[in-house]
């Protein structure tokens, strides 16, 4: 029993140390959340965002991804962000607070996008977790389906999509849907993502109309 206790204790310590490292690093670099490192790592590998691009950031609060996106898109770019939670203003980011699952919020978001096509859709959305897989997974899959639907409505030809997905029921079917819509789809597990988490990021490039 003592061995098991030590193992559990050291696992906890490692996790806390890991979390603390990224939290401190985020504070040091002025990021609002440790999630900023996830999109930074994806950007480093996949080069999704370039100067002058228009980016939609879904599930944006507290703003870590938007901070990275607006810096990459530059003065001539545009970042439109949405979250059900409030978010303190970020210079260069057009933020809409509302529940993305509601039609009126989607309509308001589409109005902000306007007639111009979007170059990149980012989604770090996740439901409030209950701890019950049979409840959480369908909720999570519903959100990523909505994000993919957003791509179909606003994404420019050859546009890009990066979305957080939780592995489990519905994952393979969703992966198939993304592959049908994009030329290339890669699965990423950023270093800053907790090892025990079922989250992965699908990075899709080359949107096919």
Curated annotation (Swiss-Prot):
The active site is at residue 164. Transmembrane segments: none annotated. Signal peptide: none annotated. The keyword Transferase applies. It is an enzyme of class 2 (transferase). InterPro entries: RNA_methyltr_RlmE, RNA_MeTrfase_FtsJ_dom, rRNA-MeTfrase_E, SAM-dependent_MTases_sf. Belongs to the class I-like SAM-binding methyltransferase superfamily. RNA methyltransferase RlmE family. This is Ribosomal RNA large subunit methyltransferase E. It comes from Shewanella sediminis (strain HAW-EB3).
């Amino acid at each position: 029993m003592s061995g098991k206790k030590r193992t559990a204790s050291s696992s906890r310590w490692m996790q806390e140390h890991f979390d603390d490292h990224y939290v401190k690093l985020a504070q040091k670099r002025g990021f609002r959340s440790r999630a900023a490192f996830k999109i930074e790592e994806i950007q480093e590998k996949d080069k999704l965002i370039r100067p002058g691009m228009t980016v939609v950031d879904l599930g944006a609060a507290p703003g870590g991804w938007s901070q990275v996106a607006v810096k990459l898109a530059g003065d001539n770019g545009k970042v439109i962000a949405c979250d059900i939670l409030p978010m303190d203003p970020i210079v260069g980011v057009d933020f809409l607070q509302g529940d993305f699952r509601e039609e009126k919020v989607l309509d308001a978001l589409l109005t902000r996008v306007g007639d111009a096509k979007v170059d990149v859709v980012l989604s770090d959305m996740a439901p409030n977790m209950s701890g019950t897989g049979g409840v959480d997974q369908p909720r999570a899959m519903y959100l990523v389906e909505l994000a993919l639907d957003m791509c179909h409505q606003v994404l420019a030809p050859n546009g890009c999509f990066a979305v957080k997905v939780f592995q489990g029921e519905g994952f393979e079917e969703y992966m198939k849907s993304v592959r049908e819509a994009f030329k290339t789809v890669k699965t990423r597990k950023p270093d800053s993502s907790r090892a025990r988490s079922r989250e992965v990021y699908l990075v899709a490039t080359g949107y096919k109309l």
